[in-house]
Amino acid sequence: MINKIPKHEIGAESKAISKIVFDTVELAKNHFEIVKKRFLDVNSWELFAGKNKAKFTLRNQEGELILNQPKVGNYISIEVPLLPNKDKDHFEWVKIEVYEEEKKEDYEAIYIRVRPTSNPTNATDETVHFLDSKATSNFFIRRNEMEISAEIYAINEIPNFEDKTISEKIRNKAVALGGMLFGSKLQWEGLTDGLIRREK
């Protein structure tokens, strides 16, 4: 599934990878079931990422909160701390464009790819996100025998200046550059660590 990640061509890129190894395949299989539940509960990602991180909410094509397993065509609204955008609900928006699962005896994985998009509750198709729609975030969880990993690859990250006012451009550049330099990596490392963490 790693070959599903779009080629990096422009802007910044980053990755966060967290791994955990178990003593037996059976223990790894059991824990991966927990990891899957966490991963597929998008509305709880902020709990796993830690304090003062972005809030993620899974939504349908009307922009309404949903509690289902994510699928292609669903939206995710993102509430960025400190610097909300000027849209009416202050959310950043991404859309799920790829969802795949793979399961074999010694290997299983789930892959989700999202891309900045418009607000589904607005009439315009203007991208409502601090990053340009060329950017993608690629989320993996996988079990390879006794090893479990959670991985996030952020690709082609450039600020979104499409049809923006000067103040919006400044805001998007500030948030995007902050994310490129340190924010996104801290956000994603918190999430990957939280997704695979052993329960006490």
Question: Where on the chain are the PLM-derived regions?
Answer:
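Short beta-strand-centered aromatic/proline hotspots
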Residues: K88-E102
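Mixed-charge, low-complexity intrinsically disordered regions
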Residues: M1-V72, P81-K88, E126-K200
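Short, solvent-exposed secondary-structure boundary/capping segments
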Residues: E100-T117
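Short, well-structured alpha-helical interface segments that form or flank functional binding sites
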Residues: K71, F91-V94, A109
